[in-house]
């Protein structure tokens, strides 16, 4: 069987126009996949040079396949139909290891055609390392590496106004472009670089904050043999992802023309502020996940897909989103409902098996950040508590009992993953309930009164403790399926 490379699979190669910090699965199935579509269907003509920002030889460089690799995009489309789309990605030209090829790395700054810089160096990547120096080859932190490269470009082109870059970090932190620019300017000051360089950074480089959204499941280890037979070649870099994707860029409108987004209808939005889109994602996608997990798991289900195909639990999630989350968000209603429908399709994706227990990690913090804001806003706007969101809180408290109904009358124990503070507190409280020394009302009040966690005393929210206690009582006495019926 043939090996995937440009000799065996010749085709068009694009000039270097994009630098990408990060070689991982996400960027390859998200940014590179979109750029490859733009290269095929428009005149973008942008080749990608990947810079490996860490000192590691694992996995091997994409150079072993001349930059070629295959994406398998699969899931439910907008019509609810299962789709599967293999694609040979041809837009990556080469990969540079900055620790072993530092001169080649700096040479990228000398290329007048380079225009865009993408990155995904993990949430910890946009960080400050005090010991980084201009003379390091390379510096440790990603922002310092980038500052060194930008300074090289500034010097090589003598501060030319038309040689600035558009920088689009994809790290999962709020206002990632703002954070990255702040650190670049910090290094410029620390290294005592010229004021003209700082002015060039500010005036002729565009740092965009972004929001990225796609579940990338990466290398499909169990399917490799079948994929090789289907595609007719060996690929060490298969990359799988869901059908849905969204790229929100906080930046100038002229970006649409530069990236040729005006010539191909991709799910990319160029906006003035990404905050409403971040709130939408956290509230609808992440919030629905967090509400679903304890309800579905205590109802005897184990995966997100299985839960959404369960008539009772699926209806609970749909109504929670439509009636209690969407109405309190500040974006056009049609955008919110469209995104909500996409989320439901993503949850039902038959190609992804999301284990509920794995999503349950740090559930208390997730409830505070993902659901509590909508719960409190709903009460403020409607004068009553949202019954399904409070039920999700009752279910979460029940979940931390650490056991669910199994075969017959047997109880099935399961691992809990959270902060030690909560694990110890719940263990004590539920032991007290079992021994009849703590009532459910007392348990709920202890949990809601923890202002260090909730950033307020939730027992002061009128009716909340009583409603959650009543719902928890129903779950304990009747079981989750009987308890949730009233909310479907």
Curated annotation (Swiss-Prot):
Q: One Pfam family for this entry, by name?
A: Mannitol_dh_C
One Gene Ontology term of the biological-process aspect is: D-galacturonate catabolic process
Q: Which PANTHER family match?
A: ALTRONATE OXIDOREDUCTASE-RELATED, MANNITOL-1-PHOSPHATE 5-DEHYDROGENASE
Q: A single GO CC term, please?
A: cytosol
Catalysed reaction, written as an equation = D-altronate + NAD(+) = keto-D-tagaturonate + NADH + H(+)
Provide the alphabetized UniProt keywords: NAD, Oxidoreductase
Q: Which GO terms describe its molecular function?
A: mannitol-1-phosphate 5-dehydrogenase activity; tagaturonate reductase activity
Q: What is this protein called?
A: Altronate oxidoreductase
The residues the record assigns to binding NAD(+) are 18-29
Q: Which SUPFAM superfamilies match?
A: 6-phosphogluconate dehydrogenase C-terminal domain-like, NAD(P)-binding Rossmann-fold domains
Q: Which protein family is named in the record?
A: Belongs to the mannitol dehydrogenase family. UxaB subfamily.
What organism does the record attribute this protein to? Pectobacterium atrosepticum (strain SCRI 1043 / ATCC BAA-672) (Erwinia carotovora subsp. atroseptica)
The EC number(s) given in the record are 1.1.1.58
Pathway recorded for this protein = Carbohydrate metabolism; pentose and glucuronate interconversion
């Amino acid at each position: 069987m043939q090996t995937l490379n440009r000799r065996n699979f010749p085709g068009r190669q694009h000039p270097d126009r994009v630098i990408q910090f990060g070689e991982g699965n996400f960027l390859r199935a998200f940014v590179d996949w979109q750029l490859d579509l733009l290269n095929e269907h428009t005149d973008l003509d942008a080749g990608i040079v990947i810079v490996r920002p860490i000192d590691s030889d694992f996995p091997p460089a994409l150079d072993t396949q001349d930059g070629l690799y295959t994406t398998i995009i699969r899931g439910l489309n907008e019509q609810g139909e299962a789709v599967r789309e293999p694609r040979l990605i041809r837009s990556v030209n080469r990969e540079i290891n900055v620790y072993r090829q530092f001169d080649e790395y700096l040479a990228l700054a000398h290329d007048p055609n380079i225009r865009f810089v993408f990155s995904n160096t993990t949430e910890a990547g946009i960080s400050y390392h005090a010991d980084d120096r201009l003379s390091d080859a390379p510096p440790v932190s990603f922002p310092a590496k980038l500052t060194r490269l930008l300074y090289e470009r500034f010097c090589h082109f003598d501060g030319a106004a038309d040689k600035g870059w558009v920088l689009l970090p994809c790290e999962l932190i709020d206002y990632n472009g703002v954070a990255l620019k702040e650190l670049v300017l910090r290094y410029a000051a620390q290294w005592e670089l010229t004021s003209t360089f700082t002015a060039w950074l500010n005036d002729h480089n565009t740092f965009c904050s972004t929001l990225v959204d796609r579940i990338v499941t990466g290398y499909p280890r169990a399917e490799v043999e079948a994929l090789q037979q289907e595609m007719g070649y060996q690929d060490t870099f298969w990359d799988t992802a869901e059908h849905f994707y969204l790229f929100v860029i906080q930046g100038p409108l002229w970006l649409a023309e530069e990236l040729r987004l005006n010539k191909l209808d991709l799910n990319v939005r160029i906006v003035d502020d990404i905050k409403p889109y971040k709130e939408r994602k956290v509230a609808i996608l992440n919030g629905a996940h967090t509400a679903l997990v304890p309800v579905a798991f205590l109802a005897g289900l184990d995966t997100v897909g299985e839960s959404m195909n369960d008539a009772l639990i699926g209806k609970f999630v749909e109504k929670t989103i439509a009636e209690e989350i969407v109405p309190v968000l500040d974006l056009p209603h049609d955008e919110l409902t469209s995104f909500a429908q996409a989320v439901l399709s993503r949850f039902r994706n038959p190609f992804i098996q999301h284990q509920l227990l794995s999503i349950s990690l740090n559930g208390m913090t997730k409830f505070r950040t993902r659901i509590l804001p909508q719960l409190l806003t709903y009460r403020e706007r409607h004068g009553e508590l949202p019954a399904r969101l409070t039920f999700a809180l009752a279910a979460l408290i029940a979940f931390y009992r650490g056991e669910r109904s199994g075969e017959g009358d047997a109880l099935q124990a399961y691992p809990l993953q959270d902060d030690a503070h909560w694990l110890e507190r719940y263990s004590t409280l539920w032991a007290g309930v079992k021994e009849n020394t703590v009532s459910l009302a007392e348990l709920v009040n202890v949990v809601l009164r923890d202002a260090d966690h909730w950033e307020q005393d939730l027992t002061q929210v009128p009716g909340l403790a009583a409603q959650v206690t009543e719902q928890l009582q129903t779950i304990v006495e009747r079981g989750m399926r009987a308890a949730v019926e009233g909310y479907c």
